Amino acid sequence: MTLAIEMKDVMKSFNEKTALRNVNIEVKQGEIFGFLGPSGSGKTTTVKILTSQLLHSVGTVRVLGKDITGPSSIDYKRIGILTDNSGLYERLSIYDNLLLFCDLYDCKKERIDEVLAQVNLLDDKKTPVKKLSKGMKQRVTLARAILHKPDILFLDEPTSALDPVNVQNIHKILKDLNKEGTTIFLTTHNMDEAETLCNRIAFLCSGEIVALDTPENLRLRYAKDQIQVVLKDKKKETVQKDELGAKRISEWMKKGELLSIHSYEPTLGDIFIEVTGRGL
């Protein structure tokens, strides 16, 4: 198994505050790995450490087999980054923003139109960035991040400003990139997004990883022996798979109040709340 990312016993402190505590992650090459947690949990700090924008306090960090010890530790031609501080040149057009990075990455210029078409911005390529909406800027930043077909793509809340249609399109782009071999490290607080994209996910709370597995295994691990019923007034009830539960269902059926019966499977959101005691 070849690892794209390794974090061993990583800690990060800012003065008296500990932002990350004993973080251990191994991300395989070709994997889409989700890092889930609420605002302030340490997701962005982790991305900054992995992309050499911030130095960890304790532990070992490796990206593409190289120890991360400072800005010169990482080959930026092999990674793509989308974060809140992935700045664009406001006075330049969309096309010229990407052209600058095309030169840095030694890409063919034809690749610019290709990625702009993917993010539905080809018709706007001459528009200055300062005239774009927040969602359009986010798509430009993604286009820039995938311009050179990186080995690893780091995405910090990549669809937070997008409408559902563009979210669906971005998800397709990411899946296609992954099929071509790109490893993706994705931070999000959107459980549906994690479910759609990720091979494995880690739950981060207050700087600590509290669960890590595939979405399927997490659901199985935290599944309860319960059934969910829907009554005529659209009210949902959850009952145990036991004698008392069977009796309650029988009573609803006799009264003609029962509409449907469903097996109960926890969502990732349910599991996160159970593990951490808080929501996203």
Regions found by a protein language model. Give the residues of each.
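Conserved ABC ATPase "signature" region
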Residues: 99, 103, 109-125
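Catalytic Walker B motif of ABC-type/P-loop ATPase nucleotide-binding domains
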Residues: 153-157
